[in-house]
Amino acid sequence: MGIVGWPDLSLAQVAEEGDVSRVIVVPDPGAEPWAVTGVLCEGLDLVVHKGLGELSPTRARPVLAKVRGGQAALLTVGVRLPGTVTEIGAEVVAVRGVGRGSGRIRGVDIEVRVASKSARPCRGVLTCGERRARPRLEVV
């Protein structure tokens, strides 16, 4: 696995659950982050690239060619590539357990949206920790 351009990502869970030596981290890929991502895509199974905005088709073409030529799945965070097969979005919609200035987070609701070229868009709410006292009706 490779991680490009995400210096504030905590690898503590990876260290507890697995072998950190199998993760290649490039927190600051320099002036050509997509070149770094392309090279990693040629030899790894999964590459995560964090960036901003949208990559133009001209700039994306060499990276996508390396993804197609290799065996990697490319997961982008915060940046959009032309020809994306599946797009996943998430947003925290509720936090439970925290009062004004005090308390502990006891539960979090995250709305997840998925859009794919081959299926209609869908969304749902993922609850981590304590559930809501009274379930609310949701149309998904």
What are these regions (language model features)?
Residues M1-V140:
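N-terminal regions of ATP-driven nucleic-acid and macromolecular assemblies
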